[in-house]
Structure formats: structure tokens, C-alpha cells
Amino acid sequence: LAEIKSALELALEKAERYGRATKEELTREKYRDQGRQLAVDFLKDGGDLDAAFSSLPAAAQVEARGAIKEVLLRNITLPRNGEMDPRMAQALEGLLSVAQDQKAMSRQKAELEQILQNFLQVRNNAYQQLKARFGAGIGQMQRALEAQMHQKVKLEVEHLPQFQEEWRKFQGQLLDQFERILEACKEKMLSL
């Protein structure tokens, strides 16, 4: 209940501050909202983000650029199931199109893509090694079960609870390690 109350208090404080916002702050927030909407539309429908961004008034572009980058960067994550999310490539292209320093953003994009490739390679290698390690002992386990049940049994390494537990543990450590690297790269991209 204390958390709910404190969250409510925070919301009330924010509403109070918002009520006292200057005209400049309201205008900046309006531009940020426009930027967020451009990014969402770009991710949803594709389209020409550069043209949409260029159509904004010059005064709006600074705030909108920051908001666009924030939305696009939120769509760049480590692949959870071993495959890249197709929206990630689109988000990277969008970042490149709104960057103030195109060359630096291009370098960061290449670095980020390398991080993602390294993550997938380490993940896949570890999965195969773990599978081979458990596979070595599965034959003996399978024979013991067949003797116990008096029928043929087919065991899949990936379905063993011990394998799944080991894999979850390793994957959690791997995600922690690569998330920090990815976040540092995304911070750099936000500033470009």
C-alpha cells in the first residue's frame, strides 16, 4: 500500500508541476510528442522518417530528434530466442536518418551490430556445448529408463530439467553481461 500511495503522491506532484509549466516547457513537450509519434509511425508503417522529420519546424527538430532516438533505441534489444527482431534493423536505419553526425552514427550502428552478432555467436556456441555435454550422459540415462520401463524410450537433451536449468542460468548471466555493453552503445547513439 505504501508503494501505491507513494506512486500516487508522485503522480500528484508531477501533475502539480505540469500545471505550473511554462509556455516553453509545454512547447518542448509538444515537440517531443510529435517526435515520439513520428518514430512510432515509422516503426509501424515504415515510410520516410527523414522527410517526416524535415517537415517539422526548425524549432521543433531538436526536441523531436531526441524523442525519436529514445523511441527507436527502446526497440533495440538483445535477441531472446536466437533471432533478431526485424524492427531492430528498421530502428537502426531510423537512427541513422535523424542523426546529426551521420558518420559517427554509422560507426556506432556497425559497433552495435557487431555486439549483437557476438551475442548470438556466444549464445549459440554455449548452447551447442551444453547440449553436447548433456548428450554425452543421456545414453546411459536412456538405457536405465528403458530397463526400468521395459520399453523403448527416446530422450531429448533439451527437454531435461537439468539442461533447462543450466541453460537458463547461463543465459541470464550472458544477458546481464551483454545488456551493459548494449546500453553503453545506445547511450552513445542517443547523443549523436
Describe the role of every protein-language-model region.
Residues 36-127:
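Long amphipathic alpha-helical segments with strong coiled-coil/leucine-zipper propensity
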Residues 23, 27, 104, 108-111, ...:
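Non-transmembrane, amphipathic alpha-helical segments
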Residues 120-160:
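Amphipathic protein-protein interaction modules
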Residues 30, 44-51, 60-67, 158-173:
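Long, low-complexity intrinsically disordered regions enriched in acidic and polar residues
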